[in-house]
């Protein structure tokens, strides 16, 4: 409870093939501030992460600084929750040829814990917790954007 009071916010990143949208939210899921970065203008992941951190710093300052941020979660195409990596994502210029340790890259830059998962699974979890699927035990979330994906919840 004390850490929630001291660090009341988390950062969410919806990493898409075209755009990356960031939000800082409180413990109730209320969005406090947002920003976005064009994903596809960066050929190298290092340049992408630097641009994201620069954009994030502006909204982090708006909520009182990094000391108010508990952690960050990333939903990404071909995201691997267990390794914190994006693996061979065909809709990302810098992600289609291999494995990208994106969670570690953001954690190293921001100094906070970062978790990463598949974007469709993250969307399903969000709907189950805050959205139209609240209270449902079985459903499928279909995501459409630069790519297509699905998150399946059973029991």
Language-model segments: which ranges?
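Glycine/GP-enriched mid-protein hinge/lid loop-to-helix segment characteristic of carbohydrate kinases
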Residues: 2-7, 23-25, 34-36, 40-46, ...
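Short glycine-rich, Thr/Ser-proximal phosphate-binding strand/loop in the N-terminal lobe
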Residues: 5-54, 67, 86-88
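Conserved S-adenosyl-L-methionine
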Residues: 14-16, 73, 143-145
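Conserved A3 ("GATE") glycine/threonine-rich loop of ANL adenylate-forming enzymes
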Residues: 18-19, 122, 146-149
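Glycine-rich phosphate-binding loop and adjoining helix at the ATP-binding site
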Residues: 45-53, 70-72, 78-138
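Alpha-helix termini
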Residues: 60-66, 131-133
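Short glycine-rich anion-binding loops that position phosphate/pyrophosphate groups of nucleotides
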Residues: 77-80, 145-147
């Amino acid at each position: 409870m004390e850490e929630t009071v001291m660090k009341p916010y988390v950062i969410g990143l919806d990493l898409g093939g075209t755009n990356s949208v960031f939000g800082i939210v409180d413990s109730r899921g209320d969005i406090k501030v947002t920003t976005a970065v064009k994903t596809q203008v960066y050929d190298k992941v290092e340049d992408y992460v630097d641009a994201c951190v620069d954009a994030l710093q502006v909204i982090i300052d708006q909520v009182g600084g990094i000391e108010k941020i508990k952690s960050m979660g990333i939903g990404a195409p071909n995201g691997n929750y267990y390794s914190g990596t994006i693996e061979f994502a065909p809709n990302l210029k810098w992600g289609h040829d291999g494995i990208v340790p994106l969670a570690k890259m953001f954690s190293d830059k921001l100094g906070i814990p970062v978790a990463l998962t598949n974007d469709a699974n993250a969307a399903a979890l969000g709907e189950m917790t805050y959205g139209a699927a609240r209270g449902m035990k079985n459903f499928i979330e279909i995501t459409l954007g630069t790519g297509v994906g699905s998150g399946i919840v059973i029991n």
